[in-house]
Swiss-Prot record:
PANTHER family: ELECTRON TRANSFER FLAVOPROTEIN BETA SUBUNIT LYSINE METHYLTRANSFERASE. Its EC number is 2.1.1.-. GO terms for molecular function: protein-lysine N-methyltransferase activity. The keyword Hydrolase does not apply. It comes from the Bacteria. This is Ribosomal protein L11 methyltransferase. GO terms for cellular component: cytoplasm. It catalyses: L-lysyl-[protein] + 3 S-adenosyl-L-methionine = N(6),N(6),N(6)-trimethyl-L-lysyl-[protein] + 3 S-adenosyl-L-homocysteine + 3 H(+). The gene is prmA. Methylates ribosomal protein L11. It comes from Clostridium beijerinckii (strain ATCC 51743 / NCIMB 8052).
Length: 314
């Protein structure tokens, strides 16, 4: 990275961080930073409970969250801004509150960019066992902790978002030594890596986005894991065999579309761990699960989001 870069930022609300980040990843922009003051305010103060170290995040008007993406000055920034605005309108149609939804662009020097996004990521403890750590940060682990090494600048899934945390917490609860796990929409690979670290025998990550596939593979290499396979494509089109757990951290509408295929991909009694579900979409998802032969065994809430765990029963 040399010279001048363009920072495109969206001022939004916490519940919209994931889909808005996805807009930028869809533009093949690997350099995305998230600032979420609610993530700080909802946790006890301490170095391992804050994802973002810089307290000035809290100074955003109305505790707004911000997604920032960094583009080369050679990119057509005006077109990017208009595209982002169009996608924000689509997100609103899904019933997700994007808050202010302001899109801004400004020039930044390379050095400013590097300091600006990396300073926000610090080690974060997700469960008693799991700590997510950026690859450039030092961290002294205890004997019980499992460390996920991650480059947060690659694809969505850093451990900062409620949906990611709840999925990892569910994996911590349900993964056993002989478990096979499929991670649908694997993004950065964080959930696949968590499953492997927690002792899963075999893990398959699947994503339609080639950028996400490459990001997952890169992050897996940082963690020296050899029992994770990452594939590009749709679940049943590219995956052979069946899983004991399928995890999907995506939006409710896509979960409903996937449910029938997931049922076919699960062993009898297998679990479907899902998140990315806002409160008013919970009934839609649980009704689809019942229709497809799943029994809901757990619904967890964190902020505006829900994590539903369902069991394949027939």
């Amino acid at each position: 990275m040399d010279g001048i870069w363009i920072e495109v930022s969206v001022i939004t609300k916490s519940e919209a961080l994931e889909p808005i980040s996805g807009i930028f990843y869809g533009l093949n922009c690997p350099n995305v930073a998230i600032e979420d003051p609610e993530d700080l305010l909802s946790r006890d103060q301490g170095p391992l409970t804050w994802d973002f170290a810089d307290i000035n995040i809290l100074e955003h008007k109305g505790n707004a969250a911000v997604v920032k993406a960094y583009f080369s000055q050679d990119d057509k920034v005006e077109e990017i801004v208009e595209y982002v605005k169009e996608k924000l309108s689509e997100i609103k149609e899904f019933g997700i509150d994007i808050g202010e939804g302001t899109v801004e662009a400004k020039k930044m020097h390379e050095e400013d960019w590097a300091n600006n996004w990396k300073q926000y990521y610090k080690p974060v403890k997700i469960t008693d066992k799991i700590v997510v750590k950026p690859i450039w940060e030092e961290y002294e682990k205890n004997d019980e902790e499992l460390i996920i090494e991650l480059d947060p600048g690659m694809a969505f899934g850093t451990g900062t978002h409620e949906t990611t945390r709840m999925c990892i917490q569910a994996l911590d609860k349900y993964v056993k030594p002989d478990t096979t796990v499929f991670d649908v929409g694997c993004g950065s690979g964080i959930l696949a890596i968590a499953a492997a670290k927690l002792g899963a025998k075999h893990v398959v990550g699947v994503d339609l986005d080639p950028v996400a596939v490459d990001s997952s593979k890169e992050n897996i290499s940082f963690n020296n894991l050899n029992n994770i396979e990452v594939l590009e494509g749709n679940l049943l089109d590219v995956v052979d065999g069946k899983a004991d757990i399928v995890v999907a951290n995506i939006i409710a509408e896509i979960i409903c579309v996937l449910t029938e295929d997931v049922k076919k991909a699960l062993n009898e009694g297998g679990l479907f761990i899902t998140s990315g579900i806002i409160h008013d979409r919970v009934d839609m998802v649980t009704e689809k699960f019942a229709e497809c032969g799943f029994e809901v065994i757990e619904i967890n809430k964190d902020g505006e989001w829900n994590c539903i765990v369902a069991k394949a029963i027939n």
